[in-house]
Design a protein with these regions (language model features):
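Structural motif corresponding to alpha-helix initiation and N-cap regions
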Residues: 46-50, 71-75, 99-103, 129, ...
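Active-site mouth loops of central-metabolism enzymes
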Residues: 37-47, 91-98, 129, 246
Length: 294
């Protein structure tokens, strides 16, 4: 190719590129495998475990997170998953069990295929300076033990972690945990709804602690009306206005949050709705997320 031909070809390529719409250059992403926290359908699981697991798969969910096995042995629960083409990368385990029964939780995780063991909650009497310091110590020890077993430990937040606590130097308990746990041993399962209700911006935490959030809970919140749940257990006090709702039906800007999934390190997205009344609720959330591009 001579110099003149090269210049003409380059100019032609520039014209074609300039004629493309701006949005064509922007890559879009979607959630490859939407997950469900089974607490959403807890009452249905108590009535018919196998049938409920099958229904979850039929909706389109590809993975689930356990919060108890609803009377089933780990092998029985795993068999139900395998039968329906589901996997369970994560499970919740109470703080008391993490302190006293961690070997059993690890054994269950290996049978079930869990890659994460998550502490889901800190009880109200422990939400003081000494309690948070103790929790950080327990989490670091648990993270070391689970890592040796090929499993990652994590903590799941609510909203009560975002109230300044005396004895922590005015810090938020959530910030205290981030600062006083080893980021390699202790990850965070960020509940995006409860963080928002707590007045915090998930993206700000993604920016300040990149890669710390491999798991997220996805549920929406609307300030309109009020449901039968006062959410005092999650928030630390009764909520007088607003209630949980299906993903896409509330006020949370999911596209803005999920555009930062790479920075956050998100690997698994679990829909949850404490107030779900039927399969219609997890179905609505699934359909929204399955179509969402960001």
């Amino acid at each position: 190719m001579n110099r003149r031909t090269f210049i003409e070809a380059s100019l032609a390529a520039s014209v074609v590129a300039a004629s493309r719409p701006v949005w064509a250059a922007a890559a879009t992403h979607h959630i490859d495998r939407v997950g469900l926290q089974l607490y959403t359908v807890r009452e249905l699981l108590k009535q018919d475990f196998d049938g409920t697991i099958a229904k979850v798969a039929q909706i389109g969910y590809g993975e689930v997170e356990f919060a108890g096995n609803y009377g089933k042995s780990p092998k029985e629960a795993r068999a139900a998953l395998d039968k329906n083409g589901l996997v369970s990368p994560s499970a919740h385990s109470p703080l008391a069990d993490i302190e006293k029964k961690l070997p059993e939780a690890i054994e269950t995780a290996h049978i079930m295929g869990h890659k994460f063991i998550v502490c889901p909650y800190i009880e109200a009497p422990q939400r003081n300076a000494d309690g948070w310091k103790h929790a950080a110590e327990v989490f670091n020890r648990a993270g070391e033990a689970t890592q040796k077993a090929g499993i990652q430990f994590a903590y799941h937040n609510h909203s009560f972690e975002f109230a300044p606590t005396e004895g922590l130097g005015g810090k938020l308990p959530f910030d205290f945990l981030l600062a006083n746990t080893d980021p390699k041993l202790v990850k965070i399962e960020m509940d995006l709804c409860w963080m928002t209700v707590g007045g915090q911006d998930p993206v700000a935490y993604f920016n300040s602690h990149p890669g710390r959030f491999p798991l997220v809970h996805v549920k929406d919140w609307t300030k309109e009306g009020h449901g039968s749940n006062d959410y005092s257990g999650a928030v630390g006090h009764p909520v007088k206005e607003g209630h949980m709702t299906n993903v896409g039906e509330g006020s949370i800007d999911w596209k803005r949050i999920f555009e930062q999934s790479g920075k956050a390190g998100i690997q698994h997205y679990f829909v949850e709705n404490d107030d779900a009344k039927s399969f219609d609720d997890p179905r609505a959330s699934y359909e929204y997320l399955a179509k969402l591009q960001f």
